[in-house]
Amino acid sequence: MRLEVEDFLRALNIEPIVLSQQPSSGKTIIEKIEYYSNVGFGVVLYTECDVGAKKGSLNHRYRARQNVVFEHGFLIGKLTRNRVAALVKGNVETPNDISGVVYINIDESEQWKNELKKEMRVVGYNV
């Protein structure tokens, strides 16, 4: 999914910065977000990486890794809500107590591409 999103952004003449591909130079992921936060828009990928449930419940659901959720919130703090979109692949639980956060579902119809472009246009991207 990451590669597909990268290719899509490049097709729009936007060069993505993929934090996991950048040199760490001894930085934590939060320090890398701070270092690379001079950007106009952020995209976070929520994928079925973990499984979790409320204590005492047998209703387990897929979740993005908890560090992804934290980093998503941190990125919103740096860029503001309207400059960050989360792409959700699969049946992934998303935090439901953060109002105004944009979650875009990825499915076979590839409608996510139009949704992401729409969000980027609102903040001034000519895509």
Model-derived features: positions:
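Switch/connector loops and helix/strand junctions flanking conserved nucleotide-binding motifs
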Residues: 51-54, 93-97
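Nucleic-acid nuclease catalytic cores
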Residues: 80-94
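Conserved beta-strand termini and adjacent loop/short-helix elements that scaffold enzyme active sites
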Residues: 19-21, 87, 106
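C-terminal interaction surface of TIR/SEFIR-family domains
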Residues: 94-127
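Conserved N-terminal substructure of TIR/SEFIR domains
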Residues: 1-42, 78
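Conserved TIR/SEFIR loop-to-helix hotspot centered on a Trp-containing motif
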Residues: 49-77
